[in-house]
């Protein structure tokens, strides 16, 4: 038996070819203007492109059809009957069957026996089918679908195809699960699929999991591909000691490619029905969002609760830009009572209200901003609110490598205002003007550098002192309305790097030795009469040891200094890859004069040497890493602070992390000094079997901060506990249950339970704990891997 092949060209395509040939014959090449019919942008003297070869998109009725069968009868220009391994093939699809009847006048194809239609990687099979090649409309009896773009499958009693992208299935079974035996599926009386709109609409649909119905809806929508679409998202649910039963039903609006919105109805068993939403937008030069919630008459609190936040960033052109971040809540306890499941927003203490307009160029940048705070007070641990900046003006000019010099100037002008604290005015108010020009001359060579630097800091204050300040600070005489300070600051920074080949753990390595010296000279100026707005004592660390001031913030205090910082670092690097295996560091300051400048209540330093700083990090193996950072007091032989951590990751989705943090109590009880801390943290993700995984984290405060921080307590307590199980089913689903308990105030905690059923190809039912696990467990990896999106090249015949 011989296979017969036939090519059918439409009348229009044949006429077009004839017209092109006629044009070619009528215009000899020698008389045709050069490039007159060439494609745009193509000019080659002496050559031209024949109109018959010009590339243009064919319409549906111009596409040629290729036919093949064991037996073929009829007229190609009228009707053809193909029998035995029959197929009709065009560039946009293939139709196969036992027999095919083709009508050239209407482009109708009728398939009988083992109908098989393939287009854009979507395959449809059935006992019979009718299809129009031009409109791609028709119908199929008892079809089976394999949707290439999503990997989904479907079967139905009947399918009506309306166009290339739209069809309706009757009495349908659908699943987006790529497994051979899907674990979940949807049954519906009808299912409308719109590929262009990326939407599937099931009517009278029931979602089954393991053949058990778990969700029913008269109207259910879902995406066909992994793209955005408008419609209801899967509901989230959980339980919390603050909200009770917590159910959220979001509706997503895919308004445009560059902006969208989500409307969320949230029911809380203890509080009532809350309405929330957010709107996001993104443009070529701007981006922002608007979000908020409203709960009328909270059943537990007895009044209305709300939250809002507006963010925006925009480039205005010519170097100008603007941004703002404005947020607010109805009351101080909003986040403690209404925290979203999986997101510990209960620790939110300050809400920013900031707006800024700025400009920048190659060497200059400036901005004007208003920066205010809403302080959310914990009645069991009240804190003094920070100063508002109303406004702040910043100007910076910088030129680097300017004939070898680095020149920079920073200046600010700020007006400070402080909100009332417990109905009282705490602290002074006023304006501060600061200018700090510096010049440096870096000398950098292979293996060493030397950088001298000099600057002059000028600060002026206009202060309004109040009776509360006079009573607290003492005599009125030293505190004038206007004060100024001028201080020269000089430093020398130098370092070297030595290298040598060596071995580490039997492997070739390169060891470096990196000594560093930093000398700082700042003369003494009496600053006791200056106010303190936004300055605090900086933590002593490797970074701070090589800084110009022991205070951080706005430099309301600049400490006198005649000191030398000595640092030494050594590293072991893999000789072939450069990967750092081990690093050891140490540093100490040597003081040549006593400290005379202090913050109010601070005890001045009299020691001639600082604490020792030591640090170490090691990748002992490819799976085990350790880190250590500590501060040791050589005078009383005690540790001032320390952090020791280790992480073991023997394989994918397996990690164990352990950390210990220690902070010694400050010598004096001053508000700006960090409180003592003694805390152990254990976090893990561990497979119990091939399918069962355990996750967890415990933060245990042996003795924690009592300085007014949210969740603080002087007694031992568990500040956070997370425990959960993950079950990795087949390729279709993953189940999770996670328990979380965390501090929301000094004497209060919240308990939450998360349930989630993740269905591949559909979405997830329940509250998503993945953000919580990713943030809380170092090295966490989801047990369910994302399924890559299908393409039009997924299947070819």
Swiss-Prot record:
Location within or outside the cell: Cell outer membrane
Residues making up the signal peptide according to the UniProt record: 1-20
Region listing for Disordered, in residue ranges: 23-45
Biological process, per Gene Ontology: Gram-negative-bacterium-type cell outer membrane assembly; lipopolysaccharide transport
CC terms in the record's Gene Ontology section: cell outer membrane; transporter complex
Keywords carried by this UniProt record: Cell outer membrane, Membrane, Signal
Record's keyword annotation contains Glycoprotein: no
Job of this protein: Together with LptE, is involved in the assembly of lipopolysaccharide (LPS) at the surface of the outer membrane.
Family from the record: Belongs to the LptD family.
Quaternary structure note: Component of the lipopolysaccharide transport and assembly complex. Interacts with LptE and LptA.
Protein name: LPS-assembly protein LptD
Organism field: Bordetella avium (strain 197N)
Taxonomy of the source species: Bacteria, Pseudomonadati, Pseudomonadota, Betaproteobacteria, Burkholderiales
Gene name in the database record: lptD
């Amino acid at each position: 038996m011989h296979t017969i092949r036939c090519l059918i060209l439409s009348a229009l395509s044949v006429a077009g070819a004839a017209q092109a040939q006629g044009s070619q014959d009528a215009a000899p090449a020698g008389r045709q203007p050069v490039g007159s019919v060439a494609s745009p942008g193509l000019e080659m003297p002496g050559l031209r492109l024949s109109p018959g070869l010009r590339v243009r998109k064919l319409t549906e009725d111009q596409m040629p059809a290729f036919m093949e069968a064991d037996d073929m009868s009829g007229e190609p220009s009228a009707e053809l009957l193909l029998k035995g391994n029959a197929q009709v093939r065009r560039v946009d699809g293939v139709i196969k069957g036992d027999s095919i009847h083709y009508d050239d006048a209407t482009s109708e194809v009728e398939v009988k026996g083992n109908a098989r239609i393939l287009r854009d990687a979507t395959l449809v099979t059935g006992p019979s089918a009718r299809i129009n090649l031009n409109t791609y409309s028709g119908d199929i009896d008892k079809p089976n679908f394999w949707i290439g773009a999503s990997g989904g499958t479907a079967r139905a009693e009947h399918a009506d195809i309306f166009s290339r992208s739209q069809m309706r299935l009757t009495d349908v079974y659908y699943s987006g699960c790529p497994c051979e035996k899907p674990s979940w599926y949807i049954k519906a009386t009808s299912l409308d699929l719109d590929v262009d709109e990326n939407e599937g609409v099931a009517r009278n649909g029931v979602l089954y999991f393991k053949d058990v119905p778990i969700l029913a809806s008269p109207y259910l929508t879902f995406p066909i591909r992994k793209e955005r679409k408008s419609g209801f998202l899967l509901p989230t649910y959980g339980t919390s000691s603050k909200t009770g039963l917590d159910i959220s039903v979001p509706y997503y609006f895919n308004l445009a490619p560059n902006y969208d919105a989500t409307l969320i109805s949230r029911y809380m068993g203890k509080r009532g029905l809350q309405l929330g939403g957010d709107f996001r937008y993104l443009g070529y030069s701007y981006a922002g969002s608007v979000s908020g919630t409203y709960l009328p008459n909270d059943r537990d609190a007895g009044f209305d609760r709300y939250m809002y936040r507006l963010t925006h960033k925009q480039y205005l052109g010519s170097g100008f830009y603007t941004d703002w971040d404005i947020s607010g809540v109805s009351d101080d306890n909003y986040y403690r009572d209404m925290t979203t499941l999986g997101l510990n927003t209960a620790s939110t203490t300050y809400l920013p209200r900031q707006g800024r307009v700025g400009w920048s160029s190659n060497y200059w940048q400036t901005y004007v901003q208003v920066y205010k705070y809403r302080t959310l007070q914990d009645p069991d641990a009240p804190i003094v609110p920070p100063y508002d900046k109303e406004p702040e003006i910043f100007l910076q000019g910088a030129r680097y490598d300017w004939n070898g010099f680095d020149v920079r100037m920073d200046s600010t002008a700020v007006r400070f205002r402080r909100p009332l604290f417990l109905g009282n005015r705490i602290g002074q108010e006023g304006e501060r003007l600061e200018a700090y020009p510096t010049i440096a001359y870096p000398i950098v060579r292979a293996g060493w550098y030397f950088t001298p630097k000099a600057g002059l800091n000028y600060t002026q204050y206009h202060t309004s002192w109040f009776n509360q300040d006079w009573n607290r600070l003492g005599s009125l005489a030293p505190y004038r309305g206007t004060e100024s300070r001028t201080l020269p600051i000089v430093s020398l920074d130098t370092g070297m790097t030595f290298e040598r080949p060596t071995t580490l753990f039997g492997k070739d390595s390169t060891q470096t030795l990196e000594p560093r010296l930093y000398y700082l000279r700042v003369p003494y100026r009496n600053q006791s009469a200056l106010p303190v707005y936004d300055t605090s004592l900086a933590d002593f660390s490797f970074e701070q040891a090589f800084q110009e001031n022991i205070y951080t913030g706005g430099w309301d205090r600049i400490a006198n200094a005649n000191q030398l910082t000595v640092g030494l670092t050594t590293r072991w690097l893999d000789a072939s890859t450069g990967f750092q295996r081990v690093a050891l560091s140490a540093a100490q300051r040597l003081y040549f004069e006593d400290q005379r400048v202090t913050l109010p209540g601070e005890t001045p330093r009299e020691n001639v040497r600082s604490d020792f700083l030591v640090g170490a990090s090691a990748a002992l193996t490819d799976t085990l890493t350790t880190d250590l950072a500590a501060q040791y007091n050589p005078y009383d032989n005690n540790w001032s602070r320390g952090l020791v951590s280790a992480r073991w990751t023997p394989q994918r989705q397996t990690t164990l992390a352990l950390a210990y943090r220690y902070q010694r109590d400050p010598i004096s009880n001053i508000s700006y000094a960090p409180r003592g801390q003694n805390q152990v943290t254990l976090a893990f993700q561990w497979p119990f079997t091939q399918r069962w995984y355990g996750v967890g984290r415990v933060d245990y405060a042996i003795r924690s901060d009592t300085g007014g921080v949210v969740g603080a307590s002087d007694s031992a307590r568990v500040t956070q506990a997370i425990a959960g199980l993950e079950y990795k089913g087949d390729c279709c689903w993953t189940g999770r249950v996670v328990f979380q308990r965390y501090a929301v105030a000094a004497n209060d905690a919240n308990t939450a339970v998360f349930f989630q059923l993740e269905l591949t190809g559909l979405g997830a039912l329940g509250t998503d704990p993945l953000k919580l696990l990713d943030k809380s467990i170092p090295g966490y990896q989801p047990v369910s891997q994302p399924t890559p999106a299908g393409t039009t090249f997924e299947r070819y015949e």
